[in-house]
Amino acid sequence: MNVINNTLNIKKIFKILPHRYPFLLIDRVLNFEKFKYLQAIKNCSINEPYFQGHFSNEPVFPGVLIIESMAQAASILIYKSTGELNINKLYYFVGVDDTRFKKIAIPGDQIFIKVTILKSNKNILIFKNIAVVNNDIICKSKIVFAKKYLF
């Protein structure tokens, strides 16, 4: 069994993801099992720039950024499962399916994200994902990654 009950802090996440502020949307990895699932958190702060315009009187964490948070969590799971962090071999986020937004996230919320590998073959990975705030599901989605060899 490949269960790792260890978190990944932001310094370890920096070594895996190329994203940086304001587009790094994973604050901590709570747990994962290689080739199975990963649990992470995104802390919503009023100081983040998108809250100024989405919406100034009623700030709401943008739904597309919930999807991006899921994609970043899935990217971390791909790396932690395969060990691949190679400029010649990349996994591209290529699709979103069956997405539903159930509730909103607002400043001060902590979004718990769980990504689970639903299907995997040589070049395609499909993830089933949920995002939760205060024990309420705020979003469900499936996302697709494709492996591309650059050389």
Swiss-Prot record:
Pfam family, one: FabA
Keywords: Cytoplasm, Lipid A biosynthesis, Lipid biosynthesis, Lipid metabolism, Lyase
Enzyme class (EC, first level): lyase
InterPro entries found in the cross-reference section: FabA_FabZ, FabZ, HotDog_dom_sf
EC number annotated for this UniProt entry: 4.2.1.59
Record's subcellular location: Cytoplasm
GO molecular function: (3R)-hydroxyacyl-[acyl-carrier-protein] dehydratase activity
Active site: H54
Database matches in Gene3D superfamilies: Hotdog Thioesterase (3.10.129.10)
Record's function text: Involved in unsaturated fatty acids biosynthesis. Catalyzes the dehydration of short chain beta-hydroxyacyl-ACPs and long chain saturated and unsaturated beta-hydroxyacyl-ACPs.
Name of protein: 3-hydroxyacyl-[acyl-carrier-protein] dehydratase FabZ
Originating species: Buchnera aphidicola subsp. Acyrthosiphon pisum (strain Tuc7)
